[in-house]
């Protein structure tokens, strides 16, 4: 590739709406161009990176015996209505009508379509197992698109779907795809971690997320440095305290706490550690019976320094469709506004669930259900009955690891892949069956496996950059090598030797670009450091007189002089390293 016949358009400054490093550098390097909110044109340099991501993904999917197809972007509403996701997904699912009034979804994912394909094509157990995948544009109408390709509305993903006879077959397919993902991310040259995760709205049971490690990541990754335990924050278990509950030493006392509605303020007023306080979180569940709507109020108790894990709360039987109670509901059930709530003397009966840590507390502080008052010296069994005890909270650094092999640490990550064991969540709703050896219909066991192709591009930058620009891992760079001739259009010797090296690199299969734009050296070097070419070779008259060229790796502090005749072998060795 010659730069004069390619399109390169760099910026000295990032647009004001670019917030994170990857967004800024992609805009400055001319990789993407904003068309609308969360919608980007992939410019030539950006598209080259995307194609390299796709190529690696495709190779490993094929190696794992997945079969490529391509499902439509626009999908009939009827399929989504079969699974209930037409209504369940809410406004992030883009819905459109054609000229005949028929409704369609602009797909954010393709479980319904692939299940429809399989239920019409798979008849016998002899046709299983099967794995289809595609690499396709998706659209999710994000409430707040931001961070460039990290959270856009239109993006590219690889989706694979496995189909098996039974749960054991699904586990085998799942492991094959899990292993393929590990190979993919290793080939990308990224630091990543696979973590246990919650299935969320997609359904099924059992899943893992793949996160690229980055300080700017939106997700908290929980892991144990001394074992293999890893989970995302939603799925990480906070185990019960190992020590038994201490005996009560204080009497129950109603204590004035004027104007102190937060646990932190109450603890400071009473000169107590925050961990001695208990916070009250009120949830509402609405139930309808024969057109009559009734409300059920739940009170969740957590230690004052802990945070509620909303995913864990939603898994409590009866709380699947909860919402946070409003102030009117709180006053009706507790007799006081938020800030002074507690489990003792509620105005109306509530269902109480206690976090494991709170269940082990004694002599604790909680709201007295009266403005400007809290109870101190509260103890289970004596002052209030023992309640349902569950894991309700987010873990914190230093918590014991659930596997008993150390303590937990937390780092930030960017989710770029997710694998799910769906089971029969979709095949049951869509009646996707096969006939077993006895001619009896059986539900197909499904798995689904996604990789965010365009998100990987942004995540790779978040992990690999400096103050000059992008530092691409070799596998993802738009070009492996850039040739930077000094005076290409003025010096015959520079032009001749540059062209010879260029042709030799091309013949050796190297992805090389020759910068023949005639830019000044400083501007040319700045462009390629910004774009992130891993290997730069400078050809100048002075060096040629000495029989040498200048080589500099993108991560190198200094340039290296290399003999002209040795440069091809030198570059090949660096590429293979």
From Swiss-Prot:
Q: What is its main location?
A: cytoplasm
Indicate yes or no for the key word Nucleus.
no
Instruction: List the HAMAP family.
Output: Pro_tRNA_synth_type1
Q: Which GO terms describe its molecular function?
A: aminoacyl-tRNA deacylase activity; ATP binding; proline-tRNA ligase activity
> Which reactions fall under this protein's catalytic activity?
tRNA(Pro) + L-proline + ATP = L-prolyl-tRNA(Pro) + AMP + diphosphate
Which GO biological process annotations does it have? prolyl-tRNA aminoacylation
Give the classification, highest ranks.
Answer: Bacteria, Pseudomonadati, Pseudomonadota, Betaproteobacteria, Burkholderiales
Cited PROSITE patterns: AA_TRNA_LIGASE_II
Q: How does it assemble?
A: Homodimer.
Q: Which PANTHER family match?
A: MITOCHONDRIAL RIBOSOME PROTEIN L39/PROLYL-TRNA LIGASE FAMILY MEMBER, PROLINE--TRNA LIGASE
Domain topic, free-text comment: Consists of three domains: the N-terminal catalytic domain, the editing domain and the C-terminal anticodon-binding domain.
The UniProt keywords, alphabetically, are:
Aminoacyl-tRNA synthetase, ATP-binding, Cytoplasm, Ligase, Nucleotide-binding, Protein biosynthesis
Name this protein carries in UniProt: Proline--tRNA ligase
Enzyme Commission no: 6.1.1.15
| InterPro entries named among the record's database cross-references | aa-tRNA-synt_IIb (IPR002314), aa-tRNA-synth_II (IPR006195), aa-tRNA-synth_II/BPL/LPL (IPR045864), Anticodon-bd (IPR004154), Anticodon-bd_dom_sf (IPR036621), Pro-tRNA-ligase_IIa (IPR002316), Pro-tRNA-synth_IIa_bac-type (IPR004500), Pro-tRNA-Synthase_IIa_type1 (IPR023717)
Q: Give yes or no: UniProt keyword Cytoplasm.
A: yes
Cellular localisation: Cytoplasm
Q: What does this protein do?
A: Catalyzes the attachment of proline to tRNA(Pro) in a two-step reaction: proline is first activated by ATP to form Pro-AMP and then transferred to the acceptor end of tRNA(Pro). As ProRS can inadvertently accommodate and process non-cognate amino acids such as alanine and cysteine, to avoid such errors it has two additional distinct editing activities against alanine. One activity is designated as 'pretransfer' editing and involves the tRNA(Pro)-independent hydrolysis of activated Ala-AMP.
């Amino acid at each position: 590739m010659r730069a004069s016949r390619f399109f390169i358009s760099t910026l000295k400054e990032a647009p004001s709406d670019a917030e994170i490093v990857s967004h800024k550098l992609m805009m400055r390097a001319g990789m993407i161009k904003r068309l609308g909110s969360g919608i980007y044109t992939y410019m030539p340099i950006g598209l080259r990176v995307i194609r390299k991501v796709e190529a690696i993904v495709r190779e490993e999917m094929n190696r794992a015996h997945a079969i490529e197809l391509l499902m439509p972007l626009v999908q009939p509403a009827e399929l989504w209505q079969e699974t209930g996701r037409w209504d369940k997904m809410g406004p992030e699912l883009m819905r459109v009508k054609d000229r005949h009034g028929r409704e369609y979804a602009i797909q954010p994912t393709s479980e319904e379509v692939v299940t429809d394909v399989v239920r019409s094509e798979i008849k016998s157990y002899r046709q299983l197992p099967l794995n289809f995948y595609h690499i396709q544009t998706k659209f999710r109408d994000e409430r707040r698109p931001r961070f460039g390709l990290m959270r856009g509305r239109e993006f590219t993903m690889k989706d694979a779907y496995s189909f098996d006879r039974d749960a054991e077959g699904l586990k085998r397919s799942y492991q094959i795809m899990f292993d393929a993902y590990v190979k993919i991310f290793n080939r990308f040259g990224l630091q990543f971690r696979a973590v246990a995760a919650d299935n969320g709205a997609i359904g099924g049971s059992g899943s893992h997320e793949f996160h690229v490690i980055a300080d700017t990541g939106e997700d908290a990754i929980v892991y144990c440095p001394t074992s293999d335990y890893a989970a995302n924050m939603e799925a990480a278990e906070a185990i019960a305290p190992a020590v038994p509950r201490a005996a009560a030493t204080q009497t129950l006392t109603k204590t004035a706490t004027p104007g102190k509605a937060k646990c932190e303020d109450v603890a400071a007023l009473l000169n107590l550690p925050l961990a001695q306080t208990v916070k009250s979180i009120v949830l509402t569940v609405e139930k309808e019976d024969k057109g009559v709507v009734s409300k059920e109020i739940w009170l969740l108790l957590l230690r004052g320094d802990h945070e509620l894990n909303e995913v864990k709360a939603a898994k409590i039987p009866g709380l699947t469709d909860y919402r946070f109670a409003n102030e009117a509901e709180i006053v009706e059930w507790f007799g006081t506004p938020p800030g002074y709530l507690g489990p003792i003397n509620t105005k109306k009966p509530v269902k109480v669930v206690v976090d494991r840590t709170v269940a082990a507390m004694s002599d604790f502080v909680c709201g007295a259900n009266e403005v400007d008052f809290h109870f101190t010296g509260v103890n289970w069994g004596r002052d209030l009955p023992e309640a349902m005890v569950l894991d309700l909270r987010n873990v914190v650094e230093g918590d014991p690891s659930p596997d008993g092999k150390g303590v937990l640490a937390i780092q930030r990550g960017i989710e770029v892949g997710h694998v799910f064991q769906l089971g029969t969540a979709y095949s049951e709703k869509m009646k996707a069956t096969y006939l077993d050896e006895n001619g009896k219909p059986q539900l197909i066991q499904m798995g689904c496996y996604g990789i965010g192709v365009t998100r990987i591009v942004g995540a790779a930058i978040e992990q690999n950059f400096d103050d000059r620009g992008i530092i691409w891992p070799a596998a993802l760079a738009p070009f492996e090598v850039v040739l930077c001739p000094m005076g290409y259009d003025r010096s015959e010797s520079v032009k001749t030797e540059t062209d010879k090296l260029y042709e030799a690199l091309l013949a050796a299969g190297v992805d090389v670009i020759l910068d023949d734009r005639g830019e000044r050296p400083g501007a040319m070097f700045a462009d390629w450091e910004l774009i992130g070419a891993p290997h730069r070779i400078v050809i100048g008259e002075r060096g040629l007189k000495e029989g040498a060229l200048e080589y500099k790796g993108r991560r190198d502090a200094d340039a290296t002089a290399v003999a002209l005749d040795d440069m091809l072998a030198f570059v090949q060795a660096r590429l293979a390293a």
